[in-house]
Design a protein with these regions (language model features):
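N-terminal Rossmann-like or analogous alpha/beta NTP/dinucleotide-binding catalytic cores
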Residues: 43-127
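N-terminal catalytic cores of NTP/NDP-binding nucleotidyl/phosphoryl-transfer enzymes
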Residues: 1-55
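Generic detector of short, locally flexible boundary/turn motifs and exposed helical patches
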Residues: 1, 35-38, 65-70, 96-99, ...
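Active-site cores that bind ATP or allylic diphosphates and position pyrophosphate for catalysis
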Residues: 89, 93-183
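Residues at the starts of beta-strands that form the adenosine-phosphate
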Residues: 29-33, 69, 130
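Structural signal for conserved beta-strand scaffold positions within catalytic alpha/beta enzyme cores
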Residues: 34, 72, 133-135
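Active-site-proximal loop/turn and secondary-structure-junction residues that shape catalytic pockets
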Residues: 38-41, 76, 137
């Protein structure tokens, strides 16, 4: 498989570059896998400590891009406490049969975030996979990040949000009919 790993909140243009890389491996008969982490307890949609997209919205975006699989790894002790080398061997190699990994330069994983891009590269020859590290995408000389997107949302800079995401931001929800006193 061709795998990219991360939180992917908002699926901004930086995330999209990673996904383009794994999608390009389809010509080598590799399935595209987005390995993401479930929401930490206590997080909600948008705002500080919250997500830009819901899980369902993220899944819809990935399907539209042509991603074969989205794996949402839960925040459970077995995963949180897993050593980085074990994560590579047990999850990436044995479960996902990884042949190609695309990540950003600051990707961290494993217990206490001890795993790094350097470790992924170091173990690549042993487990027979390729690692590609993509530089951060920029817009107007600023690094594109989910934090920056959230900041622009909070500031009401919707045109900039559109440029950062590459698609119009939207909010979805259920209309609740209150006491109808505002008529």
């Amino acid at each position: 498989s061709a795998v990219t790993l991360g939180k992917f909140d908002g699926i901004h243009k930086g995330h999209q570059k990673l996904m383009e890389k794994i999608l390009a491996k389809k010509d080598q008969d590799l399935k595209s896998v987005v390995f993401t982490f479930g929401q930490m307890p206590g997080t909600n949609i948008y705002g500080k400590g919250r997500t830009i997209l819901t899980r369902t919205e993220r899944q819809i975006h990935l399907e539209a891009m042509g991603i074969d699989y989205m794996i949402e790894c839960p925040f459970i002790p077995e995963i949180i406490q897993m050593e980085p080398e074990d994560f590579i061997k047990k999850i990436l190699v044995e479960q996902l049969h990884v042949k190609y990994i695309a990540v950003g330069p600051d990707f961290r994983f494993g217990h206490n975030r001890k795993g790094s891009v350097g470790l992924l590269k170091q173990l690549a020859p042993l487990y027979d996979y390729e690692v590609e590290v993509l530089e951060k995408e920029r817009l107007e000389d600023k690094v594109i990040s989910s934090t920056y997107v959230r900041h622009m949302l909070e500031s009401g800079e919707m045109e900039k949000v559109h440029k950062l995401l590459g698609y119009p931001y939207y909010v979805s929800g259920t209309v609740v009919h209150g006491h109808k006193i505002g008529r």
